[in-house]
């Protein structure tokens, strides 16, 4: 009989395991503000002073790679290596770590090591990758904090490829581990693993239109269903799914074929028996499993008896050797549909040659047929993929180079610009998807120059509001998810940003001409000292904020660090950058259209992508309003009579009980504030504006900034948050 808890609970505090009724249960539409406070130092055992790049520089990189190479063929009884080589397992681990990335919001990917944590550690498509990470643990234990899990998983994939004969394109470290699940990532609404598109809360609508920003076709899959759409073995329709999914992961058709064929050159699928024999995923397993899952009761449960995807067999006859055999086999045979021992759809060649039979993974004396998945068959039957497959088949070196480059892109897409790269194997070549910025080959401006330029900027016709708006529009394109965007490069002057609707009110042709004139005059009067447009845009915003603070009575210098450079149109991939276009920006009261998500939800999402805390988000909104930095100079939320002065008027007037608020539209997306006594109109507001007086948590912080003793605090906090946003992409000064 269980003893009574001395604290008065039945057996434990129900809230420890979400057993009690929570705020979310009472108010299911409540905003999730926790995404603005995740990954705090309270969960990080390494502390706020830990400098990963500094630790990585102490790493004996060659020794680590040697240890990883040795591990590849050091088969363990508790999870024996297929064909005596763990390489294919580590490739799958690295691939699935990186493969969650999607271009829509830049989230997912390899850069945080989140495969260690829920939900990814328990996704059906990640079955048995827990074993791969356990195999790596002795090496992680040995090298400690000098190598993150995020970097180690990708490096293990690279070493695996090299150990099996592929010349890789390169590797960069710099991925920093997180220590709790990433709750900001939307994986879909389905409440069932691998739910098909006909089920409730499907990610598909219309004629198989995939919901944005999702890339995977089913909940719990990394890419597509290997058996075919919704498990239907149709290679042509599978090709359609593949093209959409890989495009949303920033891959074109050639990269898609290279990755599919290159990845499937190695290893095998596992479906030795009925999946009903497989136990629960790691998060659902008991204590004695110690974080492992998918423990199988089918015969030995490992080796040739392993059950993972349900598909059974290898693609090639030499699954631990880099070669062109994938195409040899795929393109040389007619294929027939069959089912694996686990009941999964797969394809086998008709009358295969002896040389195209594979050894059993744990018995070299036994020969088995090779297989293809429905997704593989798309590489042969989709007309576009088929042409690429044929070309790669005829040109093995081109294929090897294409795969090496695509693999590097896959595993580094969310790492950010090259200024963030660390380690001895960084490729010298600049790649367009890295959003390259030219190196600075001139002397940058000093403090004296900065003061001169600030005077010129403030005396121009742009004014405080326009200077602030230009700097914000440039810098706030940054996404901390994949470290893209930001002010460096001055891409606001280039396509596609120059033509974005969110920038239309800035009159960029005229505004940039003024800045270019200031830039040209300064540069022509100095021999080797120059100012970039990128620096000038940010400096203009900083100068305007500084003036606005002074006009509010506070003589506080706004920090500015020069060193940005100007990118060219040739260095800017227009289609790729289109994903950074804001559909809404609550900091400017901008929304491109009406969406199923509310404007306040979109604000929280934007703030999270800018890596802002709740106080930083609040102080920036309040400051931007009084600075007159709204989209199209709208008066929504401008609760002040002194526009351009950095005061706390937004909070003072929002929280003033003399004002009553009324919706002006049936949708309640705009409001007017009227004097409670006279009924006269005082202000107009958006949903975002009223959020800071409506939401209890946000109101609590807003009250701090509305206090009489917080005027200077508001200014200082705004400047700190502003400076943070201006420098979000300055990895060159963060190392």
Curated annotation (Swiss-Prot):
There is a cross-link at residues 223-249 (Tryptophyl-tyrosyl-methioninium (Tyr-Met) (with W-95)). Gene3D superfamilies: 1.10.520.10, Peroxidase, domain 2. InterPro entries: Catalase_peroxidase, Haem_peroxidase, Haem_peroxidase_sf, Peroxidases_AS. Heme b binds at residue 264. GO terms for cellular component: cytosol. Formation of the three residue Trp-Tyr-Met cross-link is important for the catalase, but not the peroxidase activity of the enzyme. SUPFAM superfamilies: Heme-dependent peroxidases. The keyword Transferase does not apply. This is Catalase-peroxidase.
């Amino acid at each position: 009989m269980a003893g009574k808890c001395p604290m008065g609970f039945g057996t434990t505090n129900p809230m420890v395991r979400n057993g009690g009724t929570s705020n979310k249960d009472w108010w299911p539409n409540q905003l999730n503000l926790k995404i603005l406070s995740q990954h705090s130092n309270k969960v990080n055992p390494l502390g706020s002073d830990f400098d990963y790049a500094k630790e990585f520089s102490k790493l004996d990189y060659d020794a680590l790679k040697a240890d990883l190479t040795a591990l590849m063929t050091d088969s363990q009884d508790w999870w024996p290596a297929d064909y005596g080589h763990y390489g294919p397992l580590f490739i799958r681990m690295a691939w699935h770590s990186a493969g969650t990335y999607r271009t829509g919001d830049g989230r997912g990917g390899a850069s945080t090591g989140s495969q260690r944590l829920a939900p990814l550690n328990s996704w059906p498509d990640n079955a048995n990758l827990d074993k791969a990470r356990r195999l790596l643990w002795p090496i992680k234990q040995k090298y400690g904090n000098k190598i993150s899990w995020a970097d180690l998983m990708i490096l293990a994939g690279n070493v695996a490829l090299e150990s099996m004969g592929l010349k890789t394109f390169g590797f960069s470290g710099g991925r920093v581990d997180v220590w709790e699940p990433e709750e900001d990532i939307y994986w879909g609404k389905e409440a069932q693993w691998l739910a098909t598109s006909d089920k409730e809360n499907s990610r598909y609508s219309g004629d198989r239109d995939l919901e944005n920003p999702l890339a995977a076709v089913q909940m719990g899959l990394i890419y597509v269903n290997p058996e075919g759409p919704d498990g239907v073995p149709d290679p042509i329709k599978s090709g359609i799914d593949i093209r959409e999914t890989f495009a949303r992961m920033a891959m074109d058709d050639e990269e898609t074929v290279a990755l599919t064929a290159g990845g499937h050159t190695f290893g095998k699928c596992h479906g030795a028996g009925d999946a009903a024999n497989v136990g629960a995923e790691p998060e659902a397993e008991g204590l004695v499993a110690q974080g492992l899952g998918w423990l199988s009761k089918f015969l030995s449960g490992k080796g040739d008896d392993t059950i993972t995807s349900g598909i059974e067999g290898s693609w090639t006859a030499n699954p631990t050797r880099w070669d062109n055999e994938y195409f040899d086999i795929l393109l040389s045979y007619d294929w027939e549909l069959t089912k694996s021992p686990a009941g999964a759809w797969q394809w086998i060649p008709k009358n295969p040659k002896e040389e195209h039979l594979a050894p059993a993974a744990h018995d070299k004396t036994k020969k088995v047929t090779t297989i293809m998945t429905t997704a593989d068959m798309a590489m042969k039957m989709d007309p576009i993929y088929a042409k690429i497959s044929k070309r790669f088949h005829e040109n093995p070196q081109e294929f090897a180079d294409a795969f090496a480059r695509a693999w590097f892109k896959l595993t580094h897409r969310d790492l950010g610009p090259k200024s963030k790269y660390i380690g001895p194997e960084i490729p010298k070549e600049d790649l367009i998807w890295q959003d390259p910025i030219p190196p600075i080959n001139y002397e940058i401006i000093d403090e004296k120059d900065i003061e001169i330029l600030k005077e010129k900027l403030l005396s121009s016709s742009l004014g405080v509001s326009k200077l602030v708006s230009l700097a914000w529009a440039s810098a706030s394109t940054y996404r901390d998810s994949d470290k893209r965007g930001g002010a460096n490069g001055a891409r606001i002057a280039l396509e596609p940003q120059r033509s974005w609707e969110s920038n239309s009110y800035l009159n960029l042709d005229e505004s940039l001409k003024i800045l270019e004139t200031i830039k040209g005059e300064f540069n022509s009067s100095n021999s080797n000292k120059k100012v970039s447009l990128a620096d000038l845009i940010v400096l203009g915003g900083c100068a305007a904020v500084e003036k606005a603070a002074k006009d509010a009575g506070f003589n506080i210098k706004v920090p500015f660090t020069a060193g940005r450079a100007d990118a060219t149109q040739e260095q800017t991939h227009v289609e790729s950058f289109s994903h950074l276009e804001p559909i809404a920006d609550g900091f400017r009261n901008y929304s491109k259209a009406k969406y199923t998500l509310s404007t306040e939800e979109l604000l929280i999402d934007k703030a999270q992508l800018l890596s802002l805390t709740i106080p930083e988000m609040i102080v920036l909104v309040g400051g931007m309003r009084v600075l007159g930095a709204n989209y199209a100079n709208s008066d929504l939320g401008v609760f002040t009579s002194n526009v351009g002065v950095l005061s706390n008027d937004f909070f003072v007037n929002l929280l003033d009980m003399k004002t009553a608020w009324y919706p002006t539209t049936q949708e309640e997306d705009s409001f007017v504030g009227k004097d409670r006594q006279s009924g006269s109109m005082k202000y107009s507001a958006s949903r975002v504006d009223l959020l800071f007086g409506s939401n209890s948590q946000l109101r609590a912080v807003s009250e701090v900034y509305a206090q009489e003793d917080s005027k200077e605090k508001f200014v200082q906090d705004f400047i700190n948050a502003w400076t943070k946003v201006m420098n979000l992409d300055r990895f060159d000064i963060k190392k």
